[in-house]
């Protein structure tokens, strides 16, 4: 059974609005009780969660289920290649302790393969509009992005 979980806590709510993290955790625990359930955690890596992937990994590790990281390709302005260099450095630093997990090195290599920071204006426009429509602020949950929103 694949459980699609992109973040924990309030960041989960932001990405999967109007998700409720305590409900997700409760449901996850119920799934874990199923007899012979082969559970995997699938995470779509994107601009909103790359800087907090370490938190998701730390939440997931005690469960000892496989964690798969899939990279969001569209819309391009949410792709991790759009991160400015200083945030790519920060993301890599936060993921460094988890290089032994499948695909973590691939995520880092992919992120550095190209510079799409020219798309940051589109990222900002989309995020500002999303925040207005939901009465939320990305920077409340990912303050590292405040300079770019």
Please provide the spans of the model-predicted regions.
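Hydrophobic, Leu/Ile/Phe/Ala-enriched alpha-helical segments that form helix-helix packing faces
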Residues: 28-35, 60-61, 87, 91-98, ...
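Generic signature of intrinsically disordered, low-complexity segments enriched in small/polar residues
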Residues: 15-17, 38, 51, 80, ...
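Flexible glycine/acidic-rich beta-alpha junction loops that bind and position SAM and/or redox cofactors
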Residues: 47-51, 66-95, 104-120
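Radical SAM/AdoMet-radical enzyme domain recognition
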Residues: 1-70
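Radical SAM enzyme core and accessory elements
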Residues: 92, 96-149
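Glutamate identity and glutamate-enriched acidic tracts
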Residues: 10, 25, 29, 40, ...
